[in-house]
A protein has these predicted regions:
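A generic structural motif
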Residues: 79, 134-137, 149, 207, ...
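Conserved catalytic alpha/beta cores of large enzymes that bind or transform nucleotide phosphates
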Residues: 316-415
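Append "with occasional cross-activation on large, charged helical scaffolds in nucleic-acid assemblies
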Residues: 363, 376-648, 662, 666, ...
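Structured core elements
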Residues: 74, 84, 95, 111, ...
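Short secondary-structure boundary/capping segments
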Residues: 218-220, 304-309, 446, 491-493, ...
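Single-stranded RNA-binding regions, centering on S1/OB-family and related RNA-binding modules
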Residues: 90-100, 167-169, 214-220, 285, ...
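Charge-lined substrate channels and their catalytic hotspots, especially those that engage the 3′ end
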Residues: 1-289, 296-342, 373, 380-381, ...
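Phosphate-interacting basic helix/loop segments used at nucleotide- and nucleic-acid interfaces
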Residues: 187, 256-262, 267-283, 403-417, ...
Length: 777
């Protein structure tokens, strides 16, 4: 084999340049040389070879390979060039500087050596260096094709839409002639290495052309391998499913068609996959029925539909479209709980007492016939006492009253046990028929929305507790306790506002965090402080082990209520059916498949979230580009060493870079604030501020503001001790040239809205900021 021949030659000769090695192995010709280079590259990534500074090649010595222990994990890149090593959920990430990344790409499995251990007292992460790439994650890329004759052997290149990939991707000359207007998807054939700082790829598909309607969003989705089209065999299976249940389908099901069953969704929703019924029982308890479309009855394990659902993991929702997990024939047809038609469901029938506790329940396969298709807006009108809505739906007015009463009971119960209510604001981007954003507004959530969410939570908990008590292999939705270091940072920061949180980072109750949230409610910057607390939490994920749900303060939790759009819910439905008679064979089967499905579902969920964020940032930046040069009022959302982010009231967010400020500013890590060296002017989280928009880049999603002096400005006296320490720091840093703005910028969590002084419409966010400023004065 070539690998052994290379090693034998280098053992005999010590070291060699690539050309001499190729000649010695008779591989200098055009036919064999590329294969040699590919093998050398792979051996280097496996730490079998090393390049010297003079470009010569040699075997790594055993003592070099074994000198330091390595750690394996997944590399997570930042677009600024640095990154982090993620080992597992129980380990803190390690920081990898841009000079230590090597040729690792976001998502690669890598081996690192630890350069500097973590310092828990200082709260600093361990620092590491990539020494080997075990597995490449990037298999495809998407971008605009650029004609280029810089490298004659290639047709041109693309720049990936993924900003974490810095290098050009050169395209092999293909039978299809590319003109330079195409958005193409390519398969990666060769990765960057020393002396070869670019990718080589082959064209897989032409996604579209510049100027096509919606091509910007499609490019983002394709770059993340989120594909709308279903394979032919998947569509064939979906089309073969009957449009209505047959008598055979109803055998063994609990018949609930006589119940007054209601769906409550958005006005434009088509996949109505959940419905409820409610009764007040003679003993004063409530009967709540949560009915979910029985998707698993139609999507059988191992089928083409099932395999495609596993591959997708979840539906993806971006500004102007949905990429569904399952074909619309299912989601909008047989599995949509449309009014006055029989539908197969799985139901959680719960008896709930006045304290919000489930005292009796049944989880069953059922058949229902929904009575009303309601919208959130109409139900909110009924709750608010709108006479027209109450008259139109008089027959279910009492049901709605019962729903509200039960919702409040459940809400109180969860609050008492310590559930954290992170009711953060979300943006709704309104686009025209060409996909161009025309407005950005706050997404409204009324009692009806929270009420349905409350009932879904109850069903999810009930199902999870049922299977945990039965000690059957199961998939849980878990949210582990926050890591002490992150929580301590937040506790320290909250103390700078004069807010003391009872307990320590190692032992703090949800009740203490609830008290904090109640204390800051209504105060300037409360939304930002709640978001900072949320960011100190761990990410929820799927697991075969039950660790409870910290945020909900729930001992048991799963996802049961959305099998149309989440694979774990589909899996739970399948287990509800199969565990009716839980044989050992079924136990063993699910115990074997659940861990991998839990991991993949968690990863695919995060991919979907990333796609949604990228598209949102892009569309917000596109919207704001029209208003460059205009002034806006907002609040300081976060402060970092290189500046601070400003958020407008409708969630638009942009960066004020420290280099754009009129004097030298010092960063206080404890208070997360910046203070002017001469003026004493302070920028800290929550304070109002006036800014001017100077940049809105649709391609990167970045929005940049410039600070403007205003009545909002805060000045604090500079302490003498601070002056002395600052002088010392300035002296020690004089030898350096400073920090480049481009290298310091991180991903701006774009949140955008806004009209201008020139616009005919009075700005929502300016109105809000003015109202707040009047209150403060």
């Amino acid at each position: 084999m070539m690998k052994e021949r290379i090693m034998t030659y280098l053992k005999e000769h010590g070291k060699s340049n690539v050309n001499d090695l190729a000649a010695a192995l008779e591989m200098a010709g055009a036919k064999h040389f590329p294969s040699l280079i590919k093998t050398i590259s792979k051996m280097e990534s496996q730490s079998l070879l090393r390049f010297s500074d003079d470009g010569s090649l040699a075997l790594r010595k055993e003592r070099e390979k074994k000198k330091e222990p390595t750690v394996q994990g997944v590399f997570r890149a930042n677009k600024a060039g640095f990154g982090f090593l993620h080992v597992d959920e129980n380990e803190d990430d390690m920081f990898i500087g841009r000079n230590d990344v090597g040729y690792a790409i976001d998502g690669d499995t890598v081996e690192v050596v630890v350069k500097k251990p973590a310092d828990r007292l200082k709260g600093t992460a361990a620092e590491a260096k990539v020494v080997a790439i075990v597995d490449r994650s990037l298999k495809t890329a998407v971008g605009t094709f650029i004609l280029d004759d810089d490298k004659p052997k290639y047709a041109g290149y693309i720049r990936s839409k993924n900003q974490k990939i810095q290098q050009k991707i050169y395209i092999k000359k293909e039978p299809v002639v590319l003109k330079g207007t195409e958005i193409i998807k390519v398969d990666i054939d060769k990765y960057p290495t020393r002396g070869h700082d670019y990718f080589v790829a082959s064209v897989r598909d032409i996604v579209g052309h510049q100027g096509d309607v919606g091509i910007d969003v499609l490019e983002v989705l394709e770059s993340m391998d989120i594909v709308s089209e279903f394979p032919a065999e998947v569509l064939a299976e979906a089309n073969a499913i009957s449009e209505a249940p047959t008598a055979k389908d109803l055998i063994g099901r609990v018949d609930l068609r006589q119940e007054t069953t209601i769906t409550i969704d958005g006005a434009d929703a088509k996949d109505l996959d959940d419905a409820i019924h409610i009764k007040l029982l003679d003993n004063g308890n409530y009967e709540l029925g949560v009915h979910i479309a029985d998707v698993s009855y139609y999507v059988t394990e191992g089928s083409a539909l099932d395999k495609e659902a596993v591959r997708r993991g979840t539906s993806v929702y971006v500004t102007d479209r949905v990429v569904p997990m399952l074909p619309e024939r299912l989601s909008n047809g047989i599995c949509s709980l449309n009014p006055n038609v029989d539908r197969l469901t799985q139901s959680a029938l719960m008896e709930i007492n006045s304290q919000g506790h489930v005292v009796n329940y049944q989880i069953c396969q059922s058949v229902i016939k929904t009575t009303y298709r309601m919208t959130y807006s109409t139900v909110n009108d009924m709750i608010a006492g709108d006479e027209e809505a109450l008259q139109e739906f008089a027959s279910i007015a009492d049901d709605v009253t019962l729903m509200v009463a039960l919702h409040r009971i459940l809400e109180t119960m969860r609050s008492k046990r310590g559930a954290l209510n992170f009711d953060t604001q979300e943006a709704k981007i309104i686009v025209n028929d060409k996909g161009i954003p025309v407005d950005v507004v706050l997404r409204q959530r009324g009692i009806a929305e929270r009420m349905i969410e409350s009932f879904m939570l109850a069903a999810n908990e009930c199902v999870a507790e049922h299977f945990a008590t039965a000690k059957l292999p199961f998939i849980y939705r878990i949210h582990e306790e926050p890591k002490a270091e992150k929580l301590q940072q937040f506790i320290d920061y909250a103390s700078t506002f004069g807010i003391h949180i009872q307990g320590t980072a190692n032992k703090i109750s949800q009740e203490a965090l609830q008290a904090f949230m109640a204390k800051v409610e209504g105060q300037p910057g409360a939304e930002v402080l709640n978001m900072m607390l949320l960011r100190s939490m761990q990410q929820a994920r799927y697991s075969e082990h039950n660790h409870g749900h910290y945020g909900l303060a729930a001992e048991y939790y799963t996802h049961f209520t959305s099998p149309i759009r989440r694979y774990p819910d589909l899996l739970v439905h399948r287990m509800v059916r199969e565990y009716n008679q839980p044989s050992q064979e079924k136990r063993d089967h699910f115990a074997q498949i659940i861990p991998e499905l839990a991991t993949s579902s968690s990863q695919l969920e995060r991919r979907a979230i990333d796609a949604e964020r990228v598209v949102e940032a892009m569309k917000k930046a596109e919207y704001m580009a029209e208003y460059v040069g205009e002034e806006f009022d907002g609040i300081v959302a976060s402060v970092v060493k290189f500046g601070f982010f400003v958020e407008l009231p409708n969630t638009i967010e942009g960066l004020v870079h420290i280099t754009s400020l009129p004097e030298y500013y010092h960063f206080n890590e404890r208070t997360l604030s910046l203070q002017g060296e001469k003026s004493g002017k302070v920028f800290k989280v929550g304070q109002p501020i006036r800014v001017k928009l100077v940049k809105a880049d649709k391609e990167t999603g970045d929005i940049d503001f410039e600070y403007l002096p205003s009545d909002f400005d805060v000045v604090e006296k500079i302490k003498m001790s601070d002056k002395a320490s600052r002088r010392d720091r300035r002296k020690s840093s004089k030898s350096s040239k400073g920090i480049k703005k481009k290298e310091l910028k991180e991903v701006a969590k774009a949140k955008t809205k806004g009209k201008t002084k020139k616009g005919s419409k009075k700005p929502f966010y300016k109105e809000q900021a003015k109202k707040k400023s009047r209150k403060r004065s």
